Regions:
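Basic, flexible Lys/Arg- and Gly-enriched helix-loop patches that mediate nucleic-acid binding at interfaces
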Residues: 1-218
C-alpha cells in the first residue's frame, strides 16, 4: 500500500538470515536497507529481527504508524516458526508457554505454542508472542536449556509472509495497514482499561480485618 499524496510506503519484506535490521552498520554487515534500495524514500524497519533470524519484517516511512505498531501497549501478535535442539520435552514447552525469567531478571508474558515436528534431536514449534524484547525467543529457549537453530517470523497481526522469497518485498494492502492500526489501537485501549481497573482496586476502601459479611464469611 502506497499513500500517493504523501508518498508513504508500507512494505512486507522477507528478511534473509545474515542481514541486520538497521539503517547502517559500522561493522560493514549487510543491512535490510540494501533490499529496498529501489524505493524512492527513506524507509526504516518496524521492529526488528536479529541477524540470524529470518522472515517477515515491516518497512515504512510513516513514523506514527511504526510507533503505533511497535509500542508495547499495542500487543500485536507475532507468529514464529522456531526450530530448537535438542528435542524439547513437555516440561520445557510448558515453561516457555507460561513465561520464563530471562537473564536480565525480566519475566516473559505467556505465549501460545504449537508443536509442529517432534523428533529425536530437534523440535519445530510455532510460537505466538505479543512482546518484542531483544532476542527474546532465543533467550527464552536458552533459559530452559534449548538452542534455537532456526527462527522465522511468519506473521505479524493480519500480515502474513505468504509466498514471499528471501530478500524480496511486497506492498501491504490498505486492509493490512488498517488492520495493524486497529489491532494496535485495541491493544492500547485494553492496556489503559487494565491500568484504570488496577488503580480503582488500589483506591477501594477495605473493611476492618476480621469483619464478617452477611453470610458470616470473613
Amino acid at each position: 500500500y502506497i499513500q500517493k499524496d504523501q508518498q508513504l510506503y508500507y512494505l512486507a519484506l522477507y528478511k534473509p538470515r545474515g542481514y541486520v535490521t538497521t539503517a547502517s552498520d559500522e561493522l560493514g554487515r549487510k543491512t535490510v536497507m540494501e533490499l529496498v534500495s529501489d524505493i524512492p524514500a527513506r524507509l526504516y524497519p518496524v521492529g526488528r529481527l536479529d541477524k540470524d533470524s529470518e522472515g517477515l519484517l515491516l518497512m515504512t516511512n510513516d513514523g506514527a504508524f511504526a510507533q503505533a505498531v511497535t509500542h508495547p501497549s499495542g500487543g500485536i501478535s507475532k507468529l514464529y516458526r522456531v526450530t530448537v535442539q535438542p528435542r524439547a520435552d513437555e516440561s520445557q514447552i510448558l515453561k516457555l508457554s507460561s513465561g520464563v525469567v530471562l537473564d536480565d531478571g525480566t519475566k516473559t508474558m505467556p505465549c501460545a505454542i504449537n508443536v509442529v515436528t517432534d523428533e529425536p534431536g530437534r523440535t519445530v514449534m510455532e510460537m505466538t508472542l505479543k512482546e518484542g524484547k531483544n532476542r527474546e525467543i532465543r533467550r527464552m529457549c536458552e533459559t530452559v536449556g534449548l538452542e534455537v537453530v532456526r527462527l522465522k517470523r511468519n506473521a505479524e497481526g493480519v500480515v502474513k509472509l505468504g509466498m514471499l522469497k528471501p530478500g524480496t518485498y511486497r506492498e501491504l494492502t490498505k486492509a493490512e495497514v488498517n488492520g495493524l492500526r486497529a489491532a494496535a489501537a485495541k491493544g492500547r485501549a485494553q492496556t489503559r482499561s487494565a491500568a484504570l481497573q488496577s488503580k480503582a482496586a488500589e483506591r477501594r476502601p477495605r473493611g476492618p480485618v476480621g469483619q464478617k459479611g452477611r453470610d458470616g464469611a470473613p
